């Protein structure tokens, strides 16, 4: 199964992310985001596909198991915690991520939810404060888009 997300925000940040999953295998995300400041930026699937008031309408990180925030390789993490994407000196982040907790079908599907790129680096839940355990201290939402089904 395939999916796509077009990221847009109020500023210069834009991007496209393609998703692919074969049977019960991991979801592969391949994408490019431009207009970022150089460095790492938090990258998450948020709970809702609602962008009526911009990216803030997307709600919190997708977290069906009520866990604390963590890194993509941690046992204790939100399903939507994808860690960071890293922008080069030109503000472009090109990436490929494989994730076993995401699904493109079934009751925990991320189709119809929002993908968000954040202003700051995600501390992966290791910041030592409550906000770290909720959001990774990733800061404001620079761009977002609803994940939709794509043609196979």
From Swiss-Prot:
Say where the lipid (S-palmitoyl cysteine) is covalently attached.
5
Q: Describe the reaction catalysed, as an equation.
A: 2 superoxide + 2 H(+) = H2O2 + O2
Instruction: Specify the superkingdom.
Output: Eukaryota
Specify whether Ribosomal protein is a keyword of the entry. no
What's an example of a GO molecular-function annotation for this chain? superoxide dismutase activity
Q: Report whether Glycosyltransferase shows up as a keyword of the record.
A: no
Q: What is written in the cofactor note of this entry?
A: Binds 1 copper ion per subunit. Binds 1 zinc ion per subunit.
Q: Which cofactor does it need?
A: Cu cation; Zn(2+)
Task: Write down the Pfam families for this protein, in alphabetical order.
Answer: Sod_Cu
UniProt KW keywords: Antioxidant, Copper, Cytoplasm, Disulfide bond, Lipoprotein, Metal-binding, Nucleus, Oxidoreductase, Palmitate, Zinc
Quote the InterPro entries the UniProt record gives: SOD-like_Cu/Zn_dom_sf (IPR036423), SOD_Cu/Zn_/chaperone (IPR024134), SOD_Cu/Zn_BS (IPR018152), SOD_Cu_Zn_dom (IPR001424)
Question: Which positions does UniProt annotate for Zn(2+) binding?
Answer: 61, 69, 78, 81
Task: Name a single GO cellular component.
Answer: nucleus
User: Could you tell me where this protein is found in the cell?
Assistant: Cytoplasm; Nucleus
All disulfide bonds of the chain are: 55-144
Residues at which Cu cation binds: 44, 46, 61, 118
Q: Tell me its EC number(s), please.
A: 1.15.1.1
Give the family, as the similarity comment puts it.
Belongs to the Cu-Zn superoxide dismutase family.
Under the subunit heading, UniProt states: Homodimer.
The record's listing under PANTHER family reads: SUPEROXIDE DISMUTASE CU-ZN -RELATED
Q: What does this protein do?
A: Destroys radicals which are normally produced within the cells and which are toxic to biological systems.
Name under which the protein is recorded: Superoxide dismutase [Cu-Zn]
Recall the taxonomic lineage recorded for the source organism.
Eukaryota, Metazoa, Chordata, Craniata, Vertebrata
């Amino acid at each position: 199964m395939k999916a796509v997300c077009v990221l847009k925000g109020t500023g210069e940040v834009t991007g496209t992310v393609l998703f692919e999953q074969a049977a019960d295998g991991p979801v592969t995300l391949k994408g490019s985001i431009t207009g970022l400041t150089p460095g790492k930026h938090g990258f998450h699937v948020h709970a809702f596909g609602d962008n009526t008031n911009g990216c803030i309408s997307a709600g919190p990180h997708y977290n069906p198991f009520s866990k604390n925030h963590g890194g993509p390789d941690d046992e204790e993490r939100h399903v939507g915690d994808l860690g960071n994407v890293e922008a080069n000196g030109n503000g472009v982040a090109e990436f490929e991520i494989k994730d076993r907790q995401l699904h493109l079908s079934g009751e925990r599907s991320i189709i119809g939810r929002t993908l968000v790129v954040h202003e700051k680096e995600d501390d992966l839940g290791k910041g030592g404060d409550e906000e770290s355990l909720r959001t990774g201290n990733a800061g404001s939402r620079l761009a977002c888009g609803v994940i939709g089904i794509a043609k196979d």
